[in-house]
Amino acid sequence: MLWDSNQVYQAADAKNYETYIPTEKHIKSFEELQKINPDVIGWIRVNDTNINYPLLQTDDDDTYMNTDAEGKYSLSGAIFLHCGNKPDFSDFNNIIYGHHMEKHMMFGDIGEFTKEQYFNEHPYGNLFFDGKNHGIEFYALMQVDAYNETIFNVCPDTSEEKQAYLLEIIDNALYKRCLLYTSPSP
């Protein structure tokens, strides 16, 4: 079966989900999307990019590789949080997946961050979950192998694992910003 690539890109267009974009004052449309698909846990936006999508999570990371936010089959899939992460983003390391696509669809704009000026001009984004906006500050850019166990360790438990994670970023980032990290109180 041949797929028309335009159909794939149309399915991946963030404009398909504009009616569901939540704000703290208006979440009704977002709640409607959650009724369509209860796996919708939030929304991710990277300021001044085309990354502006519902965020999903299920107990199987393969599900949203080819399923959209409304639960329909789609080659472009959806943006989703690793199944091992807590949906309240309280883990030390939260991993969000999505296809890197052409035409600035899904995580297609991530490639732009490899340009230093673009990285410097796009430091912020937003995660909407639990009915609130939670700002994101992007502090480093790395290109890593998908099998890098330090970076893709969903829940580093020990202070040594957390230290190794941070050192891996500091030592291997293409670009980075100063960021003050304080360990949460036990």
Predicted regions and their residues:
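N-terminal membrane-targeting segments
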Residues: 1-20
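N-terminal post-signal-peptidase region of extra-cytosolic proteins
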Residues: 22-40, 57-85, 105-124, 173-177
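Mid-length scaffold segments of soluble, non-membrane domains
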Residues: 80-81, 85-150
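An amphipathic alpha-helical core segment
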Residues: 141-180
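Conserved small/polar residues in nucleotide/adenosyl-binding loops
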Residues: 181-186
